[in-house]
Amino acid sequence: MIRLFRKTSLTTLTDEQLISRVGAEQDEKAFNELYSRHARRLMGFFLRAFRYDEDEAADACQETFMKVWQAAVQFDSSSAFRPWLYTIAYNLCRSRFRHSEQAERYRSEQLATTAETYEDSSELQLDNATLQLALASVLATFPQESRTLFALRFEEELSIKQVAQVLNIPEGTVKSKVHRLLCQLKQQLHDYE
């Protein structure tokens, strides 16, 4: 018997093809493939947003993927999946910060956590740990919007266009905010030394 159609391996499909399958067919295997591709990085995004509170980050990550499942049918197949995912994650962060008083607690805890990490670092990692400590300390003093912008652009490595989509602002605004943020970081890190 000759097979006219071959089963497509999910690993060869793009994120956009997978989310389209989730939306059209509620394909759990396609959803699981998306989860396996993006959960780790998304967890890292939430860990930074929630100041390394693993429980809060895990809850937010799970809630984001629940929202992805529920909203998959609304995904615009002409757009990219990753900015859409991070838009959901960003909006969830904003909502959680708006409805809680954790932001201040996280700022003070971040300094203590970073100092502990620094003390535990080995001699070989001393310079990197010093830089990471300084960067984390400086970023902890910045507003949530600036920390989110930094995370999306430099830690999640989204393009300017993708960051603009996630934050729902013009690309030019993203460019100017990134430039201003980098200038502020440069100045404060210079002052930190």
Regions found by a protein language model. Name each.
Residues 11-16, 95, 103-128, 132:
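Internal acidic/polar
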Residues 23-24, 48-52, 63-80, 99-100:
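Sigma70-family region 2
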Residues 59-66, 79-91:
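Structural recognition of an alpha-helix C-terminal capping motif at a helix-to-coil junction
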Residues 1-10, 52, 105, 134-137, ...:
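C-terminal edge and immediately downstream basic/flexible tail or linker adjoining helix-turn-helix-like DNA-binding
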Residues 135, 146, 152-155, 160-161, ...:
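DNA-recognition helix of helix-turn-helix
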Residues 73-77, 87-108, 180:
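Arg/Lys-rich amphipathic alpha helix in sigma70-family domain 2
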Residues 3-7, 23-33, 43-63, 171, ...:
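Short, charged helix-capping/linker segments at alpha-helix termini
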Residues 37-40, 48-50, 151-158:
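Short helix-capping/turn signature of helix-turn-helix
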